[in-house]
Swiss-Prot record:
Organism, scientific name: Rhizobium leguminosarum bv. trifolii (strain WSM2304)
Principal cellular location given in the protein's record: cytoplasm
Record's subcellular location: Cytoplasm
Gene label: efp
GO BP, one annotated term: peptide biosynthetic process
GO cellular component: cytoplasm
UniProt xrefs under Pfam families: EFP (PF01132), EFP_N (PF08207), Elong-fact-P_C (PF09285)
Protein name: Elongation factor P
Listed Gene3D superfamilies: 2.30.30.30, Nucleic acid-binding proteins
Keyword Nuclease: no
Sorted UniProt keywords: Cytoplasm, Elongation factor, Protein biosynthesis
Amino acid sequence: MVKVIASSVRKGNVLDVDGKLYVVLTAQNFHPGKGTPVTQVDMRRIVDGVKVSERWRTTEQVERAFVEDVSFQYLYEDGEGFHFMNPGNYDQVVVDVETMGDQKAYLQEGMSCILSIHEGIPLALELPRHVTLEITETEPVVKGQTASSSYKPAMLSNGVRTMVPPHINAGTRVVIATEDNSYVERAKD
């Protein structure tokens, strides 16, 4: 365990609070006009998945657990959870549905991901920044509709909705940012 000041806590960090491990979901520093600056942290308890919010003074000490970030390859999903393999030593790890969260929509067989592991237990998953998916359906473009936004809604092959430019049609492969489901560019393949 390492003691750090609260203002240095970031999303994905693992904190030890009162002997229990938590994964940080969001961390924001607030500097009010009067009073001391504070750090608002939303966390998920690793043992049971309960979400907790904490507020600390930015200079307060918190304990950050040692977490190892290891590259893994996604294999498949079954009743147990999501199976990943370490390409270096062929060890397999199962990640449960709660740990995956909304990221499961972007998993593709053979995809390389970074797993944060604490004492052999996978705590968090980091996907590649961009993935290539196919547009399954999109609305037709209305000619002359330039006064409004130039993007239109579209459904991706993984079931996620996003906004794409008017020239993108169903069947087109596009690059999507996994962090916020936004369109990046048309796929070059």
